[in-house]
């Protein structure tokens, strides 16, 4: 756990937000040694924070005891250099259980993912996230996606809730997000944080930057940190020529490849980590592995991305 509050640590985008994959052995059991190495490499490469056991880390596939062990390993490997945020989800009771496990493991905060299965109204969603935020002392980021979509008025209420420090958007509705940002700025002045949480968030980085959202999750950082870091630096320094070169030559083709299979937002990333020499194992069901041809295309694309970096030097 870091000494400074999570909101303060995240408010300055010093690097990409790292969402490590969870490593498994051939028999499907956790491989904490490889997971530790994966986390350590990411921190040493320049990650601003580690988001452990979230979407890319297959939160949905982890038993509570596995979750606690992974979060604890991430905390130990970061050793306070960057904050560790852990996923928490499912129904309210289970989400609270995972939140308390994360706190016991030493995490700095929570990424609160959508409730499982149900489609709730705004009042029910607010009740869920308020109870989750009150269950621990961890600062909480609410993740908007799928069945958890909020009105601007509801996000204002989230921003007024003790313990909730930010809002991550995985929906991609920029009109809605502009209204959210404006409403919170008007009703709850302060330092409420916003995150671009779309898969391969770099693709929409310019658009989100236009409404003042510069924090984002980077799956590419898992397997091509130099590319992710170059993009992050360019985006935050206004070097749009480099941003567009990487978008056109690497990120857009990567998104096109990711769209070739369901669950590729996780399994293709995991394949990328294996391509770079770290055997993190396969994804757990119900996700499936990318095809051999798609892995070959990924390898070629990664080579192209690194070539683009050389061209820009």
Swiss-Prot record:
Q: Which Gene3D superfamilies match?
A: Aldolase class I
Which is a Pfam family this sequence falls into?
A: DHDPS
Keywords assigned by UniProt?
Answer: Lyase
What GO terms are given for molecular function?
Answer: 4-hydroxy-tetrahydrodipicolinate synthase activity; 5-dehydro-4-deoxyglucarate dehydratase activity
Classification via InterPro entries = Aldolase_TIM, DapA-like, Dehydro-deoxyglucarate_dehyd
Pathway where it operates:
Carbohydrate acid metabolism; D-glucarate degradation; 2,5-dioxopentanoate from D-glucarate: step 2/2
The kind of enzyme this is, by top-level EC class, is lyase
**Lyase as a keyword?**
yes
Catalysis: reaction(s): 5-dehydro-4-deoxy-D-glucarate + H(+) = 2,5-dioxopentanoate + CO2 + H2O
- Entry's PANTHER family? 5-DEHYDRO-4-DEOXYGLUCARATE DEHYDRATASE 2-RELATED, DIHYDRODIPICOLINATE SYNTHASE
* Family membership noted in the UniProt record: Belongs to the DapA family.
Name of the protein this chain belongs to: Probable 5-dehydro-4-deoxyglucarate dehydratase 1
- Organism, by scientific name, is Streptomyces avermitilis (strain ATCC 31267 / DSM 46492 / JCM 5070 / NBRC 14893 / NCIMB 12804 / NRRL 8165 / MA-4680)
């Amino acid at each position: 756990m870091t000494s400074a509050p999570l909101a303060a640590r995240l408010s300055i985008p010093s690097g990409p937000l790292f969402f490590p994959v969870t490593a498994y052995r051939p028999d499907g059991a956790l491989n904490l040694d490889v997971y530790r190495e994966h986390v350590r490499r990411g921190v040493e490469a320049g990650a601003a924070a580690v988001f452990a056991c979230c979407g890319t880390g297959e939160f949905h596939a982890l038993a509570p005891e596995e979750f606690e062990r992974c979060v604890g390993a991430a905390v130990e490997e970061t050793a306070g250099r960057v904050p560790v945020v852990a996923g928490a989800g499912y129904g309210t009771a289970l989400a609270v259980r995972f939140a308390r496990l994360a706190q016991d493991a030493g995490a700095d905060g929570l990424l609160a993912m959508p409730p499982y299965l149900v489609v709730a109204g705004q009042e029910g969603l607010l009740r869920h996230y308020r109870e989750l935020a009150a269950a621990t002392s961890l600062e909480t980021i609410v993740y908007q996606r799928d069945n958890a979509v909020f009105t601007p008025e509801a996000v204002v209420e989230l921003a007024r809730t003790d313990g909730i420090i930010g809002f991550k958007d995985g929906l991609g509705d920029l009109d809605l997000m502009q209204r959210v940002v404006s409403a919170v700025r008007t009703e709850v002045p302060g330092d409420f944080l916003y995150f671009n949480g779309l898969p391969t968030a770099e693709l929409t980085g310019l658009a989100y930057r236009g409404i003042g959202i510069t924090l984002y999750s980077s799956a590419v950082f898992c397997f091509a940190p130099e590319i992710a870091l170059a993009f992050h630096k360019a985006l935050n320094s206004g070097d749009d020529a480099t941003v567009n070169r990487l978008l056109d030559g690497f990120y857009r083709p990567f998104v096109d490849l990711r769209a070739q299979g369901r669950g590729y937002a996780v399994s293709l990333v995991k394949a990328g980590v294996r391509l770079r020499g770290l055997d993190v194992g396969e994804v757990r069901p119900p996700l499936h592995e990318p095809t051999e041809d798609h892995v070959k295309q990924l390898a070629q694309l990664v080579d192209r991305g690194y070539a683009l970096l050389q061209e820009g030097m």
